[in-house]
Amino acid sequence: MAHNIEPAEIRFTQSARKHRIGKARALYVLEQYQPMEVHDSHSGEQNLRWIGIDDRGLELEIIAVVTPEYLLVIHVMPYRFRRK
């Protein structure tokens, strides 16, 4: 499902910075790729997930929560770290 996400503000949680991926690199993926809806089994909410290659060629996985005021990025990680 395609989303036109254009909140006035994009915020990052501290845990989203755990893998030391810069905000600019994450923002590039958010702008260039379409998100997929994913179900959070812990909260029961629908989140958005992006998988895309940043401006330096690193494939990233990004997960965000949509609120009425802003997009809250809660997870940014190199996709190769994902357990198979």
Question: What role is predicted for each listed range?
Answer:
Residues 1-84:
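Ribonuclease/tRNase effector modules and their secretory precursors
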